[in-house]
Amino acid sequence: MKNEVVYKQLTEKILPFWNAMRDDENGGFYGYMSEDLHIDDHADKGCILNSRILWFYSTAYMYLQDEKLLDNAKHAFEFLKTYCFDPMCGGIFWSVRYNGKPADTTKHTYNQAFAIYALSAYYEATGSIEAIAIAEIIYEKIEDTMRDTKGYLEAFTRDFRPADNDKLSENGVMAERTMNTLLHIIEAYSALVHALRKKVADPAKGDVRDELFMNVVENKLAAALELMRDKFYNSDRHRLDVFFDKEYESLIDLTSYGHDIEASWLLEWAAGILDDEEITESLHPISSDLVEKVYKEAFDGHSIVNECEDGDVNTDRIWWVEAESVLGFLKAFEREGKEEYRKAAHEILAFILDKQVDKREGSEWFEMLKEDGTPCHKPMVREWKCPYHNGRMCLEILKSGIEIG
């Protein structure tokens, strides 16, 4: 089979690892594994981690048709609806205790987006009306309380009063708007539109209200894509700027190579779902520009550096940056036919399999490596360390049918 090494990475490394993180006593999946592979069964559980696990198992099930994957997706869904979703104020918590009691009750727009992304995938995998209903409720909460007339805001208290955006701000700034949140709003709304179209096409499940709601979400998706194009894309620097104040003034000179290469294909994917010719045509040159910049500036022939701030390059190799780079270059090769992009995807995948993948039995990928390939002291699982990026990389490679492994 094509990309057999990728298939084995998915089925013999990534899936078994996350299967073992399932918490059958308290629900969901364990929230923390140390670098020495010790599971802390009393660690808080990040709701973003649970959403990404839900998305991963739902999507993996649709491709592999393994009932065990469906069971894990159902397990993650039950935890989301029972514990991650706030029955008092709505929306998704930032984290809960190991037993599901609320821990960090912050409501972050980014976190809501990933819940929608996951619930949409779960609906596509199962046809669960309950899942798509929760996704719609979260969408309405975002649109009603987590944005202003100019775009999307970031962090809120449990009852949706504005709060400092410490969770998605870094590098010494406190951002009121971020490229990262908007990118994943686009991702979430695209997935929701795709799921709603499936629902509307089924007379037993969809009705006129669903079609009207779908049209509203399509309009919001179009507006979000235009916002990314008009406010976040920096044509002079060939990148997406990262952190902004409320008036869309960029707060820092930062190039995030991982986000740029991820956005290069996610924006194309979203535009394809929206099927708006004008928006699609306006995004093509942006996607091409982002890929070319990453290829010329961040790719050393084997892997991708992390980011560049004020001319200072961070040369760490981050698991998700490498995974998204494989996918970004693969998608660029599909669009543009440039052999150097297929070769780049091949080389980065080889680097991942050689260096980023932890060869220890019962482990998965190292979160971060130094420039020389030495693993940094990072946990194997935490709220941000998840199967979303590397799992999606494997699934998209396999679905593409393009040999890069």
Swiss-Prot record:
Which N-terminal residues, if any, form the signal peptide? none
Temperature dependence of activity: Optimum temperature is 35 degrees Celsius.
**Keyword Cell membrane in annotation:** no
Q: Which family does it belong to?
A: Belongs to the cellobiose 2-epimerase family.
The molecular function GO annotations come to: cellobiose epimerase activity
One GO BP: carbohydrate metabolic process
Keywords from UniProt, A to Z, are: Isomerase
Q: What EC number(s) does this enzyme carry?
A: 5.1.3.11
Q: Which reaction does it catalyse?
A: D-cellobiose = beta-D-glucosyl-(1->4)-D-mannopyranose
The cross-references to SUPFAM superfamilies, in alphabetical order and at most eight, read: Six-hairpin glycosidases (SSF48208)
Q: In UniProt terms, what function does this protein have? A: Catalyzes the reversible epimerization of cellobiose to 4-O-beta-D-glucopyranosyl-D-mannose (Glc-Man). Can also epimerize lactose to epilactose.
Q: Name one Pfam family in it.
A: GlcNAc_2-epim
Q: List the disulfide bonds.
A: none
**Highest taxon listed in the record's lineage:** Bacteria
Note the pH dependence of activity. Optimum pH is 7.0-8.5.
In Swiss-Prot or TrEMBL terms, this protein is called: Cellobiose 2-epimerase
Provide the top EC class.
Answer: isomerase
- Has keyword Disulfide bond? no
